[in-house]
């Protein structure tokens, strides 16, 4: 029978309804129909599911380790469970209740884990499947769980409670035993006070029948399980935090709240054998040391060849104010105090054997910190730490923005790795990472993926995210180009931010050319080139831009002289720029107002730039009339054009980073010219601003920079040329510059006059309902809110090669600008020829007059060719700029060609294109060059879109959106037919809005917590293959052999004493537990899950084989019995027949 597919029916319905609505929404005449494009994406290509979670577990609370499987488990205060094996093997699970995890216990080498939560629930997890699941849960109803202990190779779990009682749970059935240790029976009968909650439970390593119970008040009890009474009671004045056994079972050690350690002989309960205050000051006259901070945990580990290790956390003296948390390692007479960067949550000592009654031979200590995981090598002098292979440093500085790139050039990851490998710290342990359990998944994904994170300290990190793993590749520190403030009085002018003046807000990256551009919170932009060579930059290239919406009448020292629009360093002086040519940061107007001053001060000393990303140009917005610059809201870079553009709520600026010149510096209103649909006017005269048309096109004196500013970063350190030749060259360049300047001004004025005559297209009405913009806002987390139409911010920028006007017959380079009021404006770019002329002739920038309108702030723009394929922005392939090349080869590489993935290159396109525009409220597909609205889709009415991306999937493209109401939606292109609409995650904080992003091949991610990245997929194919891609946590490993008891110990009973716990705790001897004490909750696995927890795949196969043999044997026995019965039946039939023949002719009276 054929399976009924409801989604195909929905496809048909949505296709029919959308086509009907699209016919109504099309704004062009019926006779001018758009050519049909065959769309291949259907709803069955989409499915939403989480893939993996990377990063450090947020708010960790518990730690456990399986010494045989070599798997580490971390629980958190939010109920999350993170499991780590070998590098690349990670797993994330979540308790539905969200209660804090207070303790974790592995069933060692069984592929199972017990978690105890703060809501007094115990859960049994099956780790023998790629996605662990809960098999059983046990909810305690009348008592609070405080401590759990599961002996090695035992199925009985001891559970201590706040009331001081101990209950016993069978981990196979997850039911309570009737055996209970009551607190009033454990303590002295004469004692009148309650001993407090149970803080420790452990069995004697040499006698499983003896249970050591630690109570918070300071009482320790050795309980005999068989006789059900206390053998010994140990009392100390200070509260107990933890207890640990010596492996011989004759001594144990306790840590106390006054910073002391007490060592007790099992048979001497009167007083401790030894009292140690590790960090206490030893006073004279034998007095007791001053009390210290509590020792929260202690471990006692022995070695065959030397003194035992005593490892503890806490216990520092109270006078060490401000000292960082410490882990103390005491070995023999030496004491090492290891300082940690964060508070210690828990620690575990990794030992060679899982058996508690053998020499432990510790080799490492895992320390779980509040924001880090540290592994200390105990076998090497100095106790170095292991280099952590997990991606746990995402939060090293808080993440402020995030970008995700799938299907990158194949040479990118090796290139980034090679330069990042040189940044690694020295001094790590030489041993391999000891947590190496599990196996990698067999992923079918082979395309490279890169995640870029921007951070609050100004750093940018590149991560290899291929095949659902994460590994740091390279770290860039953008703050290196700025002067650091040494004291509060010398702080830079970062009044627009309280702290983190270097924080990254926006990242624009071209993977093909490897050009990187970042925008920071202090209204600064830095452009980087990638190089494999180390260079020394004598002077950091720098531009200052005066970007202002409105200028009040402010008196300046120059009187009526207006300040220049851009402030390039060095002006037009052809001579090399000395370091002091950087603008002074103390500039101010005559009435004390800060003016023409950037927020940060660029270094004026030579800068050594290591291989990797090297500074090409620093651009800063300056203070104007006492007002700080507004933070940047949008950013775009294009390597083919050599341009970078950025905008904020004041306006837009475009910079030629090859010539180090400002090409465009306009307020947002001036972009409209006479076509402003809101009819806005500046509220005061603008003395320092030129008319809008001229301001857009005019190239000022300051925009042409000396040749030295156009050189590569190595120019400053290159050998000087002959002075006569240099003078001639400078004179020649000045002549060329003067001519090109005059020509550019003439062209600019002509274009400006033309641009003013261009009106708004008649088919796009400017009187759209502005009230729909109530949700419009900047995507930046700290940008000033836009509450008036006059504060229209630039929200999206896109370089492309397309039709700028209706009358265009061929595409040309241009910039599309989107604003927060839903307007799209098009700016034409006239680029000079490539090669040396590109460095000498100016780029002409002019408005096209094209204005398009949507509801809500513009988020994303892209372009399709006539076949529906995505037209990517033009780019220049990467090349090494710091290596001299042959002239003809250099000319060849200097030519910038736009590259397209469509069948026909963009130079040959004569047919129409489609512009895809996504705003906070709707999406439109505009046909070019006619500028008719081909398709329109209202994405949301009651919410707004936080992120929209045009992405490739299954050899096609679609629009993917994430809304503030938690819905993830996808639409086909170009018809904007709905394909997916799933409620996933509501917007709970700005962190999600700031970091959520889609990329190609159905991948997406966001920052789920301050320390973790959550990746998800909306591709059906990836969801189906996810099981294969995930790693396996459990691998069949033989349990190590138990330690040899030795001849004499076996003869005289000195070895470990075993205990038949089944007989002691089973229902037959101890009875049933009270039903009101705890409630059993079966997990999704049910009875089959129990089998899975007890055995797993290998065990099940063995059992199945055994069952098959038994079944075969039984079948054989049955066959034999059947044959015997058949033979007996035949014999009986034969005898009956003989008797019948014998008496057949006889009469009845003859018998």
Swiss-Prot record:
Keyword tRNA-binding recorded: no
Cellular localisation: Cytoplasm; Cell membrane; Cytoplasmic vesicle membrane; Cytoplasmic vesicle, Secretory vesicle, Synaptic vesicle
CDD domains recorded: R-SNARE_STXBP5
GO biological process, alphabetically ordered: exocytosis; Golgi to plasma membrane transport; positive regulation of exocytosis; protein transport; regulation of exocytosis; regulation of synaptic vesicle exocytosis; regulation of synaptic vesicle priming
SUPFAM superfamilies tied to this protein: SNARE fusion complex (SSF58038), WD40 repeat-like (SSF50978)
Pfam families, A to Z: Lgl_C (PF08596), LLGL (PF08366), WD40 (PF00400)
MF annotations from Gene Ontology: GTPase activator activity; myosin II binding; syntaxin binding; syntaxin-1 binding
v-SNARE coiled-coil homology domain mapped to chain residues: 1086-1146
One Gene Ontology CC term in the entry: extrinsic component of neuronal dense core vesicle membrane
Ranges: WD repeats: 61-94, 101-140, 145-181, 200-234, 240-272, 294-336, 344-378, 400-477, 505-619, 633-695, 794-851, 860-934, 939-983, 997-1020
Keyword Transferase: no
Main location class: cytoplasm
Biased composition (Basic and acidic residues): 881-892
SMART domains, A to Z: WD40
Modification Phosphothreonine, positions: 762, 784, 1039
Biological role stated in the UniProt entry: Plays a regulatory role in calcium-dependent exocytosis and neurotransmitter release. Inhibits membrane fusion between transport vesicles and the plasma membrane. May modulate the assembly of trans-SNARE complexes between transport vesicles and the plasma membrane. Inhibits translocation of GLUT4 from intracellular vesicles to the plasma membrane. Competes with STXBP1 for STX1 binding.
Family, as annotated: Belongs to the WD repeat L(2)GL family.
Subunit structure: Interacts with STX1A and STX1B via its v-SNARE homology domain. Part of a complex that contains STX1, STXBP5, SNAP25 and SYT1. Part of a complex that contains STXBP5, STX4A and SNAP23.
Protein name, entry field: Syntaxin-binding protein 5
